[in-house]
From Swiss-Prot:
Biological processes per GO annotation: cell division; karyogamy; protein folding
Sequence ranges assigned to domain CS in this UniProt record: 8-98
Organism: Dictyostelium discoideum (Social amoeba)
Similarity field: Belongs to the nudC family.
Function statement: Required for nuclear movement. May interact between microtubules and nuclei and/or may be involved in the generation of force used to move nuclei during interphase.
Pfam family, one: CS
Entry keyword Glycoprotein: no
GO molecular function, one term: unfolded protein binding
Gene: nudc
Protein name, per record: Nuclear movement protein nudC
InterPro entries, per the entry: CS_dom, HSP20-like_chaperone, NudC_fam
GO cellular component, one term: cytoplasm
Length: 171
């Protein structure tokens, strides 16, 4: 997955993020096996320890809550630990991973363009409708909402032929 923010460096790890997840990368000094690591991901806390050296790499309260059941970690070549945290409330930037650590300026993050296929069905339909209506307005044509209002008005006029709408004004 491509990360939308630049790589951010902390004392013991680097991290990057998208609006929905954060990925931490930890370079271990000496190769270890996964059983040599203690990694505990709670909804609001992260602990990473090297059991061989008894070194605590990370132990702190997360910036915001995560979906604990979706989070995971992998160890590559015994030296590269990667932890993926899925944000409980997506569609937001985190200024840090662990509270109290140095923070980044989230207003400086330049997200990548997203594709309509990145959205769930309901959101995608809403975005497609907005784009369609924007295009219609640019062409001087009525939007879907304006067309619907006009259709309802025409139906009402047909159901009430005895009413005079000649001087009616609508915005």
């Amino acid at each position: 997955m491509s990360k939308e923010s630049q790589v951010n460096k902390c004392d013991r790890y680097t991290w990057s993020q998208t609006l929905n997840d954060c990925t931490l990368s930890i370079k271990l000094e000496n190769p270890v096996k996964s059983k040599d690591l203690f990694i505990k991901i709670d909804n609001d806390h992260l602990t990473v320890k090297n059991l061989i050296t008894n070194d605590t790499i990370i132990d702190g309260k997360l910036y915001k809550n995560v979906k604990k059941s979706d989070c995971n970690w992998t160890l590559e070549s015994g030296k590269n630990l990667e932890i993926e945290l899925f944000k409980l409330k997506g569609q937001e930037w985190w200024s840090c991973i662990i509270q109290g650590e140095s923070e980044i300026d989230v207003t400086q993050i330049k997200p990548q363009n997203s594709s309509l296929s990145d959205f769930d069905g309901e959101t995608r339909a809403m975005v497609e409708k907005m784009l369609y209506n924007q295009n219609r307005k640019a062409q001087g044509l009525p939007t879907t909402d304006e067309e619907e209002k006009q259709r309802i008005f025409e139906t009402f006029k047909n159901e009430h032929p005895d009413m005079d709408f000649s001087n009616a004004k609508f915005n």
